[in-house]
Regions:
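N-terminal organellar transit peptides
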Residues: 1-97, 103-177
Length: 177
């Protein structure tokens, strides 16, 4: 039976000179298992409480989840002008990498952490026309993802597409390169 209650795992800690946000777990509106998750609504609520003149440290350990939610979180966080440092503490995979690839942020990946990018996925059903529409949506999602990765990494579209097509895993050291 699906878990229809979102169980928040996003935490805020206000320090004198910095705000700390923890994003731990899958990114989803709801989760089908008994696992905690976070989404863009929670991030927007937390972000509204953040002092806009104070830098933010974000700690993330996430296997990914909803691309739409991760894109929204990227957009929400990109509005902060006082500086953001994102710390990958364990895993940033799939959609979570869209949060770690925030253009205006410094990204730090802890030794031993992993980073993984791949093409977006979907579970779809319907007739041929509906499935063709879903393919178009997936291609547009992949295009948006590539754009974010290119902006953050400086790699060109062909290189990013190749890495996504291969479902590429990086060590902390490889991801920084």
């Amino acid at each position: 039976m699906p878990n229809t209650e979102l169980r928040p795992i996003l935490a805020i800690q206000e320090k004198e000179e910095i705000t700390i946000l923890n994003f731990f777990g899958p990114i989803a509106e709801k989760w089908w298992e008994d696992e905690k998750c976070f989404n863009e609504a929670e991030v927007a609520k937390a972000f509204a409480a953040v002092n806009p003149n104070k830098p933010i440290d974000i700690y993330i350990n996430s296997p990914g989840g909803s691309v739409a939610s991760a894109l929204a979180i990227n957009g929400i966080l990109s509005r902060h002008k006082a500086g953001i440092t994102i710390h990958v503490t364990g895993l940033a995979a799939s959609a979570a990498t869209l949060i770690t690839s925030l253009k205006n942020a410094k990204t730090v990946i802890s030794k031993g952490s992993l980073f993984m990018i791949h093409n977006p996925m979907s579970s779809a059903y319907g007739n041929a026309e509906e499935l063709e529409k879903q393919i178009d949506v997936l291609n547009k999602c992949a295009e948006s993802m590539r754009s974010i990765y290119m902006e953050k990494s400086g790699l060109d579209e062909k290189e990013i597409k190749s890495l996504m097509d291969a479902e590429t895993w990086f060590t902390a050291e490889e991801a920084v390169e």
